[in-house]
A protein has these predicted regions:
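Nucleotide-activated chemistry modules centered on ATP-dependent adenylation/adenylyltransferase
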Residues: 2-180
Length: 180
């Protein structure tokens, strides 16, 4: 109990804010280096292998010889294109790592049996909860930092994305090194 309290004090919204202020104008490489140095071995890198942001982060970590100090993971929803798997396999070969797949507890058939067909159309929040949110929570369990490819130019809701923020839901630091 005492150890958990000390850990909660060490990494909290308050001191993450201080670190975020220090790194707000830093390069992606500097942010990645600082985060890996401070939070490894509990650093997770989410990568969809379907867009450029995650690929850039994996490439940067590899060039900085930091890839072996993080867990690169992806959410295998059961609906990924074969081209996405091809990109992942090529990245794994090129950089010598193996990405961890996190999958929903329900197969697509089980989901349809329990919730009916086309859940994504009728209740997208429930569908994403099953296929993305729950597997992502599993991936982040016990981690201290989560590196994402989120960029401020991706949507109106992401315009104010900080370089570092405390994520209360997962109790870790969420990192956006490519924010600008």
């Amino acid at each position: 109990m005492f150890y958990e309290s000390v850990l909660a004090i060490e990494v909290s919204e308050v001191n993450v804010g201080d670190m975020a202020s220090e790194l707000e104008s830093a390069s992606a490489e500097t942010v990645l280096r600082e985060v890996v140095e401070r939070f490894s071995p509990g650093v997770a890198v989410s990568c969809s292998f379907g867009g450029p942001s995650g690929l850039v982060i994996v490439d940067q970590l590899a060039r900085m010889n930091l890839l072996d100090r993080v867990e690169v993971y992806y959410l295998d929803t059961g609906l990924l294109f074969s081209a996405t798997h091809d990109v992942r396999e090529e990245m794994e070969r090129r950089y010598g790592f193996e990405a961890t797949a996190y999958r929903p507890q329900l197969s697509l058939v089980q989901q349809a049996s329990l919730h009916g067909n086309d859940l994504w159309d009728r209740d997208p929040d429930e569908c994403c909860g099953i296929r993305k949110v729950a597997p992502n929570a599993e991936a982040l369990g016990g981690k201290s930092a989560w590196i994402t490819g989120i960029r401020r130019d991706q949507s109106v809701g992401r315009e104010e994305t900080p370089v570092l923020a405390w994520n209360a839901r997962f109790r870790l630091v969420k990192v956006a090194p490519l924010r600008d």
